[in-house]
Swiss-Prot record:
Keywords: Acyltransferase, Endoplasmic reticulum, Membrane, Transferase, Transmembrane, Transmembrane helix, Wnt signaling pathway. This is Protein-serine O-palmitoleoyltransferase porcupine. It comes from Drosophila melanogaster (Fruit fly). Signal peptide: none annotated. The active site is at H398.
Amino acid sequence: MDYQYFEEESDYIDLDEEEEDDDVVTAGSLDHRFGQPNGEEDYYFGGDDVEEELVVDGHGVLELAGRLLESLQSCVQPSVLQVMQYVAPMLLLCLLCRLLCLLYSQRRRLTSLAPLHLFHFACGLIILQITVGYRLLLLLLLAAVGYLLLQLLRLGRRGAQVLAVLTVGSQFLYELLIWRRRSDWPQLRGIQMVVNMKLISLGFDLTASGQLQARIPGPFAYLGYIYSPATCALGPWVSFGCYMDCLVPRNSWLVSLRRLLPNVVICVLAVTVSNCVAPALSDFFGDSSHFLVMYWDALSVRSSHYFVGMMAQALLVASDQRLDGATKESDMLGPLISQPWRIEWPRSISSLVRSWNIPMHEWLKRYIYAPCKPTASTSRGRILVVVLSTYLVSSLLHGMDLRIYLVLISLAFLAEGESLLRRQLASLLNACITANLCPGKERCRYSHCPSKRRLNSLSYWLARLTNLAFTALAIFHLAYLGVVLLGDDLEVGEDGDSFLWHWQQAGYLSHYIGLGTFVLYLFIS
């Protein structure tokens, strides 16, 4: 998923430039489902002998408990075991790379950085060999092509733009013409997407003032950056400068281990919810409420994303690799890739999608949105073009997936409409009900702000209820859009239902609501 890009007058007093630009949409993530046994529906059974007095809304409490217990026995244990088998080697290799770099850097004279790059490259290759097997050869071939494309930077800023177009376009055409029907490409696509983001960022960073500012990295530095063990398998994107700053570890081992444990625990919980709990609840509520079915199915997708994000955070912590941007590290978790608490209970659509993949948000804002950044006098049509262009680049980075295209365009439509409407309402009512989080009573520009009012104030409760209504609406949109991403393909299933079946059953309500927000905004503006 992506980011809400919108620029106008500041909602709050003294907002710095970073906060003004922070309305963008992330796309995406790598959605994997580990350890889910085949024939999962066979594990959820029962309830035929439930007593009638234990029935709530037509469903037995004992039936639900029985299904969850069966899921615990038949699904959770194999899921956790498979995840640990997948995670442990990656963590150990990241720790090994960190140890080797630390030992080498303690020499009296650090005459060359080449060994540090080689440590990263070697450990990254082993991780990819464990992850993708023989297909690693294809990734190395694509990396070699990428290094050749870097030579275009000698043309200056135009060379960086050509590099970006060729990098994104080549992956799109490669999948379209050759790999569309290959079952192994979807896994490689996520890895190659991160590589492409690194190439593009490196090109623009080296030609920031219109000409080549520094020497193009040598082969060792390039391979160490592209295949660093902290980011090569699951991401996220980090800039070349950030990679160089973290070549020599600085944090203590105790701090890293303290942060590593909660990331692994949350990772296990996320895969348990994704593979076992959410499918069981979706099956149980299947006959009662279509919204609940959509919500639990979408929760399975989101939890899969949380698993990947938390696993990637654990690898960053193990390698002592920091992230770009102004986002502060969490004392408990370290560098943050995703913020599930802001996704599951969002203030707005734009806030939840900004929290979906924070490094990708930073990449899109820095290299796609900022160069086309609209000014205060820019027309509304120009702003819309910039927003759609950013979403288009984000979609192309993910390769050919019609579901992602539909979700991203829908998010652009919904988030922009909500942001415009709430900004206009906040201005008319002088109330803190915009899509952005309130910065506190000292900086909020609105008189009717909950942080400035007491509990017995009417304006306090009106602002709270308005924000709560938009939160509930964002949760509905989250379920409506997320359920489309469930599954691996676009083909019609055995029961004849297409991947848009849930949208059809909901009457495309979310899209009509989005259209209504635009109409209401135009009416009151």
